[in-house]
């Protein structure tokens, strides 16, 4: 029983550490007469550990009859763009070298798009890498965005 409780706490901590995205909109890429269209959707999120960084993600989403019920597995097609949108005052040396900043389920079972933040201390730059993961195997598809940390408004 203690193990189940510990696993539940660890799962909640893992979920709490990642940012949640807001959907900004979608563009249909195919026409399906009697079911939802395939589309590309744009979402945004703020890095939860680095205030002053915002990212936008475009992801392919599969239409069809499974889509309204969350039964479709979205393809591993995505891109990410992250930018400095305000002052960044976090001490990079206190951040992990590799940490998940965002995760979004892309199927009802075990598949997710994840964005990890890495640090290039030599160049004072944050690196965001998007991947698709599954419990058994993921996809080699990936995307990268870099955020050089610049002075902001005299700070």
Residue positions per predicted region:
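C-terminal partner/receptor-binding element of secreted or periplasmic proteins
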Residues: 122-155
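Sec/Tat signal peptide C-region and signal peptidase I cleavage site
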Residues: 17-21
């Amino acid at each position: 029983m203690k193990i189940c409780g510990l696993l539940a706490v660890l799962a909640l901590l893992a979920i709490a550490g990642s940012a949640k995205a807001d959907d900004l909109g979608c563009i249909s890429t195919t026409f399906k007469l009697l079911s939802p269209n395939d589309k590309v959707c744009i979402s945004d999120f703020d890095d939860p550990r680095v205030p002053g960084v915002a990212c936008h993600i475009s992801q392919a989403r599969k239409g069809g009859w499974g889509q309204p019920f969350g039964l479709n597995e979205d393809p591993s097609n995505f891109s990410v763009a992250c930018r400095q949108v305000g002052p960044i005052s976090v001490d990079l040396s206190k951040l992990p070298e590799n940490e998940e900043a965002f995760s979004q389920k892309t199927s009802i079972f075990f598949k997710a798009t994840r964005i990890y933040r890495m640090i290039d201390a030599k160049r004072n730059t944050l690196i965001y890498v998007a991947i698709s993961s599954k419990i058994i195997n993921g996809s080699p598809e990936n995307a990268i965005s870099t955020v050089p940390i610049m002075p902001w408004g005299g700070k």
